[in-house]
Amino acid sequence: MAVSVGSGLWIILTLAVVLFYFLVFDVFPKVELLARLFLIGKLREKGNRSKIFNLFDVPKRWFTHFYMLGVVVNTSLLILLARVVVFRVPFPQPVQNIFNTLWAPNHTPEGVSGTAVVLVLVMEELQVLRRCYECLFVSVFSDSKISVVHYIMGLLLYLTFGSCILASTDFNNFRMTGVDQMGLVCVVVGCFLFFLASMLQHQTLHILSKLRKSHSGVVENRQHLLPNGGLFEYVSCPHFFTEILIYLAMNIVVQFQHQACLSIGIFVLVNQVIMSLMTHDWYRKNFRMFPKDRKAVFPYLL
């Protein structure tokens, strides 16, 4: 089965992230434009600030837009999918055209269980709903910026995720098929990991928000401070670590047999590991009391 357009998109973006990392830190470390396009938030605060490059920046709080878009798109797809499953009403033709484009040049559906596909979409729905809530009511964003490249990439992920997942199914004859014994084990393990990672990520974001709030919940500062407690005792970036676990859980549910889900999972893995390494290095340089045994993203490993 050929690599689909949807999967190819995320493979290319994964390679682009790796390429940019080496360009910024090894090949052209003094080219400000590359650094401004690649680095985000506190990682770029001490660099030069040519006003012309502000054109490529957006507020970091715009991360909220990712999850708002994800809620709208994913909820819409779940509603349309429910109509297909319950009432046998096919997806609207424009939506089918999007699916066909993302799955091209393939025409034969993947052999992934329909039940597993639905579970992945439900997991993504829970993820974007929770993250949207956290961005609006938990997180306290600094006044730092991200590049428009990161912003567009984030929008693209949450715009295409659900469609990429559904594109490889037989969406005209979608069925909630059963799963075999191994499939059931994968569903149970994947769902357990998903809820565990989601809970730990929520705890992590509360720890980060408390660094900028008083005991009464009033925002006191927007500084970057050294977090402690929870998974921060083991890694510098537990929010990135748990994000990796969440998309790993989705791939476990589909038994690593869904091309697009795997491609997106690899993109998340590579992107979060690179961002974690840079953030870890920033903490070590800026805090003398930084714990020596704390890793970047994977406890006890990296």
Name each model feature, range by range.
Residues M1-A104:
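N-terminal signal-anchor/initial transmembrane insertion module
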Residues M1-D26, L157, M176-L302:
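Hydrophobic transmembrane alpha-helices
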Residues W10, F63-V73, V120-Q127, H150, ...:
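Hydrophobic alpha-helical transmembrane segments of polytopic
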Residues L15-K30, V72-V89, E124-S139, L157-F171, ...:
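Membrane-embedded alpha-helices of multi-pass membrane proteins, especially ion channels
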Residues F28-F66, L129-Y151, K210-V218, H224-Y234, ...:
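Helix-loop boundary elements of multi-pass alpha-helical membrane proteins
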Residues K51-N54, V58, T108-V118, F141, ...:
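Juxtamembrane loop-transmembrane helix junctions in multi-pass integral membrane proteins
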Residues P59-W62, L80-S163, A167-S168:
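Intramembrane catalytic core of multi-pass membrane enzymes that act on lipidic substrates
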Residues V86, S139-D143, D170-F174, S209-K213, ...:
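Transmembrane helix-loop junctions in multipass membrane proteins, especially transporters and channels
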